[in-house]
Amino acid sequence: MALAVSGLHHVTIRVQDPDRARAFYEETLGLPFIEIPVDQAFVREWKGNPSEGTLLATQIGSTFLILAPPLEGTPDDDRFSERRIGVDHLAFGVDDPAVLEEVTAALEEASVPTAGIETDPVLGKPYVAFRDPDNVQWEFFLAS
């Protein structure tokens, strides 16, 4: 059965320190976030998260990126690892190669480690990879 999926609606990432994560995404990548209070009914019941605070949301194309505080019981020093089953990395698609240069410059200015613009060995497309403050690997990938 083929599903009529129109795209990826949202990605939610649990972050250790929402303020630190927000600063990284807003100041380094220029992604503006809005705050969604956790005490709203639909959020209170969401995934059984009893914590107070806010969810942070931004829209990238037609996809929403949501940053959520850690669930109760998450170790204070927990960080993302692609060596566990689950997500390996996430990639933003861009249509203009100049965006890759802009992202690389912004990452370097913010002292975020990156190998610069590389070429994907399978697709032959340029991309730039980096890690956020919670160690999640992100890529900006030339989609066209």
Feature locations, PLM:
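Acetyl-CoA-dependent GNAT
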Residues: A68-P75, A143-S144
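Short, charged/polar, Gly/Pro-enriched secondary-structure boundary elements
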Residues: L65, P75-D76, D134-Q137
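A generic structural micro-feature
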Residues: L3, G48-E52, S81-R84
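Vicinal oxygen chelate
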Residues: A2-A4, L8-Q16, L56-Q59, D78-S144
